[in-house]
Regions:
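N-terminal Rossmann NAD(P)H-binding glycine-rich loop of SDR-like oxidoreductase domains
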Residues: 7-29
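Structural motif
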Residues: 8, 73-74, 117
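Conserved glycine-rich Rossmann-like NAD(P)H-binding loop of the short-chain dehydrogenase/reductase
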Residues: 31-41
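Conserved Rossmann-like nucleotide-binding pocket used by diverse enzymes
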Residues: 10, 35, 55
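Conserved Rossmann-fold NAD(P)-dependent oxidoreductase catalytic core, especially the SDR/UDP-sugar
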Residues: 77, 103-132
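NAD(P)H-binding glycine-rich loop region in Rossmannoid oxidoreductase-like domains
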Residues: 52, 59-97, 129
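A short, basic/flexible loop-to-alpha-helix module at the beginning of a structural domain
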Residues: 1-6
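Short loop/helix-cap segments at secondary-structure boundaries that form the rim of catalytic
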Residues: 43-50
Length: 132
């Protein structure tokens, strides 16, 4: 499926390393309507672009996730709590919030009916239990 470059693309976790690079690449490919969302304050984002919509919001909050997904035809859900080796084993409650984040973003995209494609990416910092 070819993505329409005029369709609204939502990138959650956009203030992080991978999310920031995805936003950059989508801009370079000519996508016109990008909504970048991250829980971090804008000045803490890995990279930020002033010619797109940048939003600081907490996707663990249902209303914020629904606001973020409003009108989005394509969703790249990269938002997650992470912290490297040992994080999952030592921060189970935080990991449960990542599940809540994914649930809220997915529900918002589905229930608003505009989303054609939804991409979920696991954290870059997932390790086998024996390496935690």
């Amino acid at each position: 499926m070819q993505m329409d470059k005029d369709g609204l693309v939502l990138i959650t976790g956009a203030g992080g390393f991978i999310g920031g690079h995805l936003v950059r690449d989508l801009r370079e490919c000519g996508f016109q309507h990008l909504r970048a969302v991250d829980i971090k304050p804008l000045h803490e984002w890995y990279q930020r672009f002033d010619d797109i919509e940048n939003v600081q919001a907490d996707m663990t909050l249902r209303e914020a996730a629904y606001d973020a997904t409003k009108g989005a035809r394509y969703v790249f859900n990269l938002a997650a709590d992470m912290g490297g080796m040992g994080f999952i084993e030592n921060n189970k409650a935080s990991c449960m919030l990542s599940v809540l984040t994914s649930t809220h973003v997915l529900m918002g995209a589905k229930e608003q009916g505009d989303c054609e494609r939804f991409f979920y990416s696991s954290s870059a910092c997932v390790y086998a239990a024996g390496k935690q």
